[in-house]
Regions:
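Short acidic/glycine- and proline-prone juxtamembrane loop motifs at membrane-interface regions
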Residues: 104-112
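Transmembrane and membrane-interface helices of multi-pass
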Residues: 76-79, 86-100
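Perimembrane helix-loop-helix junctions
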Residues: 148-173
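Membrane-embedded alpha-helical segments of multi-pass membrane proteins
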Residues: 59-67, 111-119, 139-146, 168, ...
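Specific aromatic-rich, kink-prone transmembrane helix
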Residues: 71, 112-131
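Membrane-interface alpha helices of multi-pass inner-membrane proteins
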Residues: 100-101, 117-120, 130-154, 177
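Transmembrane-lumen/periplasm boundary regions of multi-pass, lipid-linked membrane glycan transferases
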Residues: 172-182
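TM-lumen/periplasm interface segments of multi-pass membrane proteins
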Residues: 1-83
Length: 182
């Protein structure tokens, strides 16, 4: 019934908003929420109305925002900043209202994409082509916004059309797989 995922999501939505992202993000949610599911299954735990379960879900956003801050520190170090200055980069990121409001107040899942894109950008800056392509292959499946970062980065570094096409195929393969699956 994997092929019926979106149909099932529409039929059984509890919030009025059915599944709108590609399947990798929901896989991540499933892995993260496995402890609450096990409590629900074996201990009759009402996870939809339980504050600890809601806080557990919000903790996922905290983990990804801290991961993004850590990656920004690494990017700053790659750019030649000393360790103290790199910490300021993370501080400014974590204190920005464009981070605090969406991540901690609204609980938007875009921070997952941001963290994965930053991993890809860091690999790009270090010259790790394989890492860059693999991170962006994942990022492109999380949200299409990543494509608008991925394509210019490929074109910035590579000018030979065959290699551009090859890298585009690799970077967009995950997205194509998700679209073909559903």
């Amino acid at each position: 019934r994997v092929a019926d995922f979106y149909t099932i999501a529409i039929e059984h939505t509890s919030s009025g908003h059915p599944a709108v992202y590609d399947i990798p993000l929901y896989f991540l949610f499933g892995v993260w929420n496995l402890p609450t599911y096990l409590l629900y299954k074996f201990a009759d735990y009402d996870y939809l109305n339980a504050t600890p379960a809601q806080l557990w879900l919000k903790t996922m956003m905290l983990v990804f925002v801290l991961l993004a801050a850590r990656i920004l520190m690494r990017i700053a170090r790659t750019m030649g900043m000393d360790a103290d200055r790199a910490k300021w980069v993370a501080f400014y990121f974590l204190s920005a209202m464009s981070v605090v409001l969406p991540v901690f107040v609204i609980v938007q899942y875009d921070i997952v994409l941001v963290a994965v894109m930053l991993l890809g950008l860091h690999a790009y800056m270090k010259g790790n082509q394989r890492g860059f392509l693999l991170w962006f292959m994942l990022a492109n499946t999380l949200k299409l916004f990543a494509v608008f970062v991925f394509i210019p980065l490929v074109l910035l570094k590579e000018k030979r059309l065959r290699r551009v096409a090859g890298q585009a195929v690799v970077g967009l393969a995950g997205l194509a797989f998700c679209r073909l699956l559903y």
